[in-house]
């Protein structure tokens, strides 16, 4: 079996796994599977011609499938809506993905691949960003209409309750930044890491900010932490990475990050400090972003059955 056929077989198995979870009503698992596959497909769709065995037309179709998976994930997150991308729609993607090498029909959905924004490994962007303060200062000068909106965030629904277990909901209210108004397509990536920087839960992206004013970017969005508080390992932390699009470089960059440790989990409002990138998941070399009183503003809600 060729390498390409092995890749297609792997993608097909992942898609079927996602639709199985979807049909069984296991929404958290379905969203997670769809998101994992979508990222794999996006990475292939964005790969340079000299490092991919797929043609440009095939990569465009792969990118469209990734967009459809993002749309289904978004539909599952907002289950009260009767509209959006359906499970039956996703199932129509299976024969397209399996026959991508010979597929020559019109794509059944009016979608476009996620915009070609670079996917960078952690820390890679640091080698590309020179004179950042100067560059960021002009980043907001152009019309935001020039830059396509991101696919909706990858927020996951609340976990089922368990006797004696505590669920944590964190509302991201706003973040304080001196150049808040210049950030393009800002969003926050939320992850839960152990002391070694290993993920303890699925990573979630918020939708884009709802508004920007003065020195604040407002989100007003709730994140459901995907593990009961009692099951989080000692030394774990919840990370918040603020990201925005850099049009001159054509990639999405982490501007700063914040984190909350286990002893800070309690009901009510909390403000936490912002740190300079790159994101230090092991929390060993932390540098404050600014001496100004600018923070990430959160509201925590604990729910115990």
UniProtKB/Swiss-Prot annotation:
It holds the Pfam family Aida_C2. SUPFAM superfamilies: Domain from hypothetical 2610208m17rik protein. Keywords: Developmental protein. Residues 126-137 have a biased composition (Acidic residues). One of its GO terms (cellular component) is membrane. The keyword Transmembrane does not apply. InterPro entries: Aida_C, AIDA_N, AIDA_N_sf, C2_domain_sf. Disulfide bonds: none annotated. PROSITE patterns: C2_AIDA (PS51911). It comes from the Eukaryota. Residues 126-146 are annotated as: Disordered. Acts as a ventralizing factor during embryogenesis. Inhibits axin-mediated JNK activation by binding axin and disrupting axin homodimerization. This in turn antagonizes a Wnt/beta-catenin-independent dorsalization pathway activated by axin/JNK-signaling. GO terms for biological process: determination of ventral identity; dorsal/ventral pattern formation; negative regulation of JNK cascade; negative regulation of protein-containing complex assembly. Residues 153-220 are annotated as: Axin-binding. Belongs to the AIDA family. The keyword Zinc-finger does not apply. One of its GO terms (molecular function) is phosphatidylinositol binding. This is Axin interactor, dorsalization-associated protein B.
């Amino acid at each position: 079996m060729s390498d390409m056929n092995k890749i297609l077989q792997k993608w097909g198995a992942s898609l079927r796994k996602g639709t199985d979870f979807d049909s069984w009503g296991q929404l958290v698992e379905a969203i997670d599977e769809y998101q994992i596959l979508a990222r794999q497909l996006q990475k292939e769709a964005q790969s340079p011609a000299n490092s991919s065995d797929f043609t440009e037309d095939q990569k465009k179709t792969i990118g469209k499938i990734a967009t459809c998976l993002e749309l289904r994930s978004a539909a599952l997150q907002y289950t009260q809506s009767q509209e959006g991308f359906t499970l039956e729609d996703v199932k129509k993607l299976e024969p397209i993905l399996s026959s991508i090498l010979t597929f020559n029909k019109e794509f059944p959905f009016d979608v476009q691949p996620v915009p070609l924004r670079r996917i960078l490994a952690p820390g890679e962007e640091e080698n590309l960003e020179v004179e950042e303060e100067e560059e960021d200062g002009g980043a907001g000068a152009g019309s935001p209409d020039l830059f396509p909106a991101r696919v909706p965030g990858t927020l996951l629904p609340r976990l089922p309750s368990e006797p004696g277990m505590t669920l944590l909901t964190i509302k991201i209210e706003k973040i304080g930044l001196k150049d808040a108004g210049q950030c393009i397509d800002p969003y926050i990536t939320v992850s839960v890491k152990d002391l070694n920087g290993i993920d303890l839960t699925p990573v979630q992206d918020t939708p884009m900010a709802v508004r920007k004013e003065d020195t604040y970017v407002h989100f007003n969005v709730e994140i459901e932490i995907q593990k009961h508080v009692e099951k989080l390992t000692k030394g774990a932390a919840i990370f918040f990475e603020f990201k925005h699009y850099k049009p001159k470089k054509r990639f999405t960059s982490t501007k700063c990050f914040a984190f909350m440790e286990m002893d800070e989990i309690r009901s009510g409002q909390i403000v936490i400090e912002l740190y300079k990138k790159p994101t230090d998941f092991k929390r060993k070399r932390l540098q404050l972003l600014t001496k100004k009183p600018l923070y990430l503003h959160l509201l925590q809600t604990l729910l115990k059955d």
